Amino acid sequence: MEPNPNRQPVELNRTSLYLGLLLILVLALLFSSYFFN
């Protein structure tokens, strides 16, 4: 009967996961650049 409150946390979790992956990728790029340099 109330799909909105159920969808919001799922979307937040997905966005948090995507943000975490992006942060990990950025950190990996920074570490790789430091190692290469």
UniProtKB/Swiss-Prot annotation:
InterPro entries named in the record: PSII_PsbL, PSII_PsbL_sf
Keyword flag Disulfide bond: no
Positions on the Cytoplasmic side per record topology: 1-13
Alphabetized Pfam families for the sequence: PsbL (PF02419)
Compartment(s) of residence: Cellular thylakoid membrane
Lumenal side: 36-37
Biological process, per Gene Ontology: photosynthesis
Alphabetic keyword roster: Membrane, Photosynthesis, Photosystem II, Reaction center, Thylakoid, Transmembrane, Transmembrane helix
Entry's transmembrane regions: 14-35
Membrane topology, from the record: Single-pass membrane protein
One cellular component (GO) term of this entry: photosystem II reaction center
Co-factor remark: PSII binds multiple chlorophylls, carotenoids and specific lipids.
Described purpose of this protein according to its UniProt entry: One of the components of the core complex of photosystem II (PSII). PSII is a light-driven water:plastoquinone oxidoreductase that uses light energy to abstract electrons from H(2)O, generating O(2) and a proton gradient subsequently used for ATP formation. It consists of a core antenna complex that captures photons, and an electron transfer chain that converts photonic excitation into a charge separation. This subunit is found at the monomer-monomer interface and is required for correct PSII assembly and/or dimerization. This subunit may make specific contacts with lipid(s).
Subunit (UniProt): PSII is composed of 1 copy each of membrane proteins PsbA, PsbB, PsbC, PsbD, PsbE, PsbF, PsbH, PsbI, PsbJ, PsbK, PsbL, PsbM, PsbT, PsbX, PsbY, PsbZ, Psb30/Ycf12, peripheral proteins PsbO, CyanoQ (PsbQ), PsbU, PsbV and a large number of cofactors. It forms dimeric complexes. Part of a photosystem II (PSII) assembly intermediate complex PSII-I; crystallized from a strain deleted of psbJ, it forms monomeric PSII before addition of the oxygen evolving complex. PSII-I includes 3 assembly factors not found in mature PSII (Psb27, Psb28 and Psb34).
Similarity field: Belongs to the PsbL family.
Listed name of the protein: Photosystem II reaction center protein L
Native source species: Thermosynechococcus vestitus (strain NIES-2133 / IAM M-273 / BP-1)
Gene: psbL
